[in-house]
């Protein structure tokens, strides 16, 4: 379903539009003619992720790191990530955005309609698309990027959900299969920055924030997230990239964090083994978002995420009735596309 909808996603702005099929894009010819990623790389061409529990202050820190180092900041990918980066940027109705709800998860995490795992699966796909966008930006411009969480840390929520009995073992197996065939195609971050905030402090911040849905999050769920971070994520990532850990108080000093990042040796991880040929193949993948998403589709029946043929067709038809979604990008008169008959 996600693949079908993404094929019709139009660009943000309508107007006189030359043929989409002939839009200039990076490809083998550009590579042969000298378009090499390594030529654009500098000491600041790094992919940095900032991780931490809910309300840990990672968003503020990630933005400050990006500003101080001159990197591109990617806010955390949510349910409407695709909507925010395509079309007019406005969120689409829930049936076109994974048919899941974060608010419903907080209110009723054990809902028998499968919302909890549907949410987790959709968020992983959203993070995958964002990670591809971040890599594409890095490889095409040489400018480093800073993300809030990533496909490498997404599993901490899955583990917490399973330990709390929110999802079935079959859901965990499905997630791990999807992760296995997707994550192997990408390079890990150069740096992981982890903000360690104790669960009682996290709960205090949630209460202070005042979101009625988030206020229903249990301490046990938050503790399981922290345990997954410290017990699995950080040890695994320390073998692939540089890892920096800070307390809640230390993370407030963004200047010190940036200084630590600049002093890292970057002497481990798969980035050291990359050459222009490898990076060319990676860039070809990440710029093709349909191919990126295609890896998330595996032939396994799971009630939580399986959509029947008739329902799929109905949702697809409803999607094409939205403004600018009936035809390919540049061919929709209802959003201002002109000279369509000449294309």
Curated annotation (Swiss-Prot):
The entry's localization annotation reads: Mitochondrion matrix
Modification type N6-succinyllysine: residues: 110
UniProt GO BP: mitochondrial electron transport, NADH to ubiquinone
Residues recorded as bearing Phosphoserine in the entry: 238
Keyword GTP-binding listed = no
Q: Which organism is it from?
A: Bos taurus
UniProt protein name: NADH dehydrogenase [ubiquinone] 1 alpha subcomplex subunit 10, mitochondrial
Q: Name one Pfam family in it.
A: dNK
Cytoplasm listed as a keyword: no
Q: Which residues carry this modification: N6-acetyllysine?
A: 110
Purpose of the protein = Accessory subunit of the mitochondrial membrane respiratory chain NADH dehydrogenase (Complex I), that is believed not to be involved in catalysis. Complex I functions in the transfer of electrons from NADH to the respiratory chain. The immediate electron acceptor for the enzyme is believed to be ubiquinone.
């Amino acid at each position: 379903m996600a693949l079908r909808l993404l094929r019709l996603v139009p660009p943000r702005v309508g107007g006189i539009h030359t043929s989409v099929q002939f839009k200039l894009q990076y490809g083998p010819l550009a590579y042969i003619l000298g378009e090499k990623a390594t030529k654009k790389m500098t000491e600041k061409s790094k992919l940095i992720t900032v991780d931490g529990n809910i309300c840990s202050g990672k968003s503020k820190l990630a933005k400050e790191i990006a500003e101080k180092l001159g990197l591109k900041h990617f806010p955390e990918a949510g349910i409407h990530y695709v909507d925010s980066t395509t079309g007019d940027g406005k969120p689409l109705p829930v049936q076109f955005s994974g048919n899941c709800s974060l608010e419903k998860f907080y209110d009723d995490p054990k809902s028998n309609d499968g919302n909890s795992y549907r949410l987790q699966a959709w968020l992983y796909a959203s993070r995958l698309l964002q990670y591809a966008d971040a890599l594409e930006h890095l490889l095409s411009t040489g400018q480093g990027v800073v993300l809030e969480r990533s496909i490498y840390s997404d599993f901490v929520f899955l583990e917490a959900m399973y330990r709390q009995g929110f999802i079935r073992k079959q859901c965990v197996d499905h997630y791990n299969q999807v992760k296995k065939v997707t994550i192997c195609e990408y390079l890990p971050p150069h740096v992981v920055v982890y903000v360690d905030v104790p669960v009682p402090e996290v709960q205090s911040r949630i209460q202070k924030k005042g979101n009625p849905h988030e206020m229903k999050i249990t301490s046990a769920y938050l503790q399981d997230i922290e345990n997954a971070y410290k017990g699995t994520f950080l040890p695994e990532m320390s073998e692939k990239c540089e890892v920096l850990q800070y307390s809640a108080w230390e993370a407030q000093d963004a200047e010190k964090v940036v200084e630590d990042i600049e002093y890292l040796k970057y002497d481990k991880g798969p980035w050291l083994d990359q050459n222009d040929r490898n990076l060319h193949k990676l860039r070809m993948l990440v710029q093709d978002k349909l191919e990126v998403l295609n890896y998330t589709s595996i032939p396994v029946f799971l009630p939580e995420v399986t959509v029947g043929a008739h329902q799929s067709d109905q949702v697809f038809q409803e999607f094409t009735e939205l403004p600018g979604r009936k035809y390919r990008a540049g061919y929709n008169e209802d959003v201002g596309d002109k000279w369509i008959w000449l294309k």
